[in-house]
Each structure stands twice: as structure tokens, then as C-alpha cells.
Amino acid sequence: MTPERKEKLDRVLSKRQPDVTIVLENVFDSHNISAVMRTCDAAGVQDIYILNTKIPRHKKWGAKSSSSAAKWLTVHQFENAEECFRELRKSYSTILTTHLSDNAVSLYEIDFTRSVALVFGNEHSGVSDEIREMADGNFVIPQVGIIRSLNISVACAVTLYEAFRQKNNAGHYNGQRIDDARFKELFKEWGGREEI
């Protein structure tokens, strides 16, 4: 490995944010999933959860959309909502779904300096009632147009870059946030040598 490559892997890993994640529930289009993965990588989100309770497990992602982002992320696939939420609760203190409801908060009211998992539903019906009941609340992306929805990959990008803005302002990208063991594990997975 060249010194430049090692430096790049070190730099990227030191900016990974262990306290924010994306959950995609029954998203049909693999290209949408891939576009979300690309945004996760760009914003420093390491873990992404794919929950398929109504559709078959995804075997591949849309390569053109992801620019191979999947190989740099830790993808957790679940077919059972309870199991998925049990895992999420181990790492994230709050789980919010994207859903237009009376009690939904604005994206800009979320404190992204705290631990949070963000659930996005499928392209046709959004987040299911089951998942909304299991979550801690709902949020919406403020809009002023006629159509009150965004493509899932666009909604995810808007959301993650608000998280990025807040976390950047709070200094979360200024130093390593993942623990040393995870840093070394990912470095090795990404093709680095054992000694860091």
C-alpha cells in the first residue's frame, strides 16, 4: 500500500460518525439504495441498515448509482423488524422515521450531535405503521411545493447533509469518533495492513 493510500484510509476512517445511521425499509429500487449508500459514504456514515419485511433480500446494489460505495460501508440486512430494532437500540438512543404526521418535527429541529437512527420507507407507501409504532418519533423535511414528497435518495441526502452541517459545526469531524478496534477492523477490510 502506498503512503498516500494509507493516509487516505486513515483520514476517511477518522471522520466516520458512529452515532448516526440510515435505515431503509422495504426500498424496492436497488439504484435508490445505492444512491443512499453513496451519500452515507460522503457524509461519513459507516453503517446502513436494510430492512426487507415485504420484499426479497437484496443481493446486489445499482453499481452506477453507488460508485462502489457499498464496499466502504457496513451493510446490515434484516428481514425481521424486531431484530433490526433490537440491534439499532444497542447503538442509537433515538430512532426517527420520515413521516408526515401531526406530531412530526422538522428536520431542522433534530439534534444531530446526539445518537440517532433515521428510517426512510419505500418509494410507494413510505414507512410502515409497524415501524412508526416502534420508533421514537417522526420528522419531515420542510417543503413549500405542490408535491409533498421527495425521492428517497434525495430525502436522505438532504437529511444527512443537515446532520453533517450540525456535526461539523460541533467539531465531530475534527478527530476520530469510532473506537480503535473498529478503526483497525475497517482499515483491514478496506485493504490496509494490520499495523496502523
Residue ranges of model-derived segments:
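Post-transcriptional modification and biogenesis factors for structured RNAs
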Residues: M1-I196
